[in-house]
């Protein structure tokens, strides 16, 4: 699953042609969901070129059950919110949103990827889909 997530974020951060297939819905209100963790990837990290910045991971109620148990039920949604990191004196603050990556569990709809559909929204804009019709690959 980690490789699939990294692939989603890579596609979202490097794709310039935006698709329009709404297979995975935009997660309205995701910042009010469960906050799972945050991290900052800084220059010098091997993934900095593609994934540098502040990462926040959010999960809906069903996904939290998956984190606590052994499997994620259908309807689980996990969000990878990637923002630029801005140095502000001795602090790091959030800059512009780079992408909102979404993993949506639906075993019937996304059979070829273990039940997960993937989408990235460029700059967090619901109209800027970067995965589109490839949501299940």
Model-derived features with residue positions:
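Cleavable N-terminal signal peptides
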Residues: 6-7, 17
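Catalytic cores of secreted/periplasmic or lumenal enzymes
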Residues: 2, 18-21
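N-terminal post-signal-peptidase region of extra-cytosolic proteins
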Residues: 53-68, 88-89
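Sequence context surrounding c-type heme c attachment/ligation sites in exported
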Residues: 20-48, 69-137
